[in-house]
């Protein structure tokens, strides 16, 4: 699979970057529509977006570099080679929440309304961005037989044929799962849920899928013998459950009063 889409004056434009940009643009468009549901000033939301986007990318890269320090410590000049891949979703999500919280305070936005607004936008961008891994021939699973991979479209078969072997298209599994989560979040948006519930459900549903899919991958970021994505996913699942229970208990108490 050729990771380069085209060249402009000798500069390679890679599919990875194109798909990341596409995900960001579509997520921004969805945020515009959802800002009306939550009565959020879109100019203020754009201010949050302008700050959170670069900070999230920085955190996504930093997270990836830290857990691949054996390589980047020996090749520090490669730390900036983002267009070749190497953005960790969990790092980006953590960066987005931190910067989003700080900006919500600065622009006087309700933080829970903000994260409920953007939760489906996150998962939409993730679903699209995963295809960048496909073109980079990364984030795939272990070796599978031709009988297994033959159930997939031909272009997936070709893309997952690497160095003489076929591999699990884990990027595809996660992209499909993310689309399912997106549909769920959009369907429950207008339900009478406590503030923050959409985001908490995003944490739970996304992390459930990521936990199981990560177990198939061969290039997981590791901390000793632990797959970091699975550890963080478990933390997010537990945190999401606690927060959604707490917020709905608080919501019922407020309603009774």
Curated annotation (Swiss-Prot):
Pathway note: Protein modification; lipoprotein biosynthesis (diacylglyceryl transfer)
Membrane topology: Multi-pass membrane protein
Key words, A-Z: Cell membrane, Membrane, Transferase, Transmembrane, Transmembrane helix
Residue ranges that the Swiss-Prot or TrEMBL entry lists as coiled coil: none
Cited PROSITE patterns: LGT (PS01311)
UniProt: a 1,2-diacyl-sn-glycero-3-phospho-(1'-sn-glycerol) binding residues: 130
Molecular function terms from GO: phosphatidylglycerol-prolipoprotein diacylglyceryl transferase activity
TM regions (residue ranges): 8-28, 48-68, 84-104, 109-129, 169-189, 196-216, 225-245
GO biological process: lipoprotein biosynthetic process
Enzyme Commission number, as recorded: 2.5.1.145
GO cellular component: plasma membrane
Purpose: Catalyzes the transfer of the diacylglyceryl group from phosphatidylglycerol to the sulfhydryl group of the N-terminal cysteine of a prolipoprotein, the first step in the formation of mature lipoproteins.
Family, similarity comment: Belongs to the Lgt family.
Protein name stated in the entry: Phosphatidylglycerol--prolipoprotein diacylglyceryl transferase
Organism encoding this protein: Clostridium novyi (strain NT)
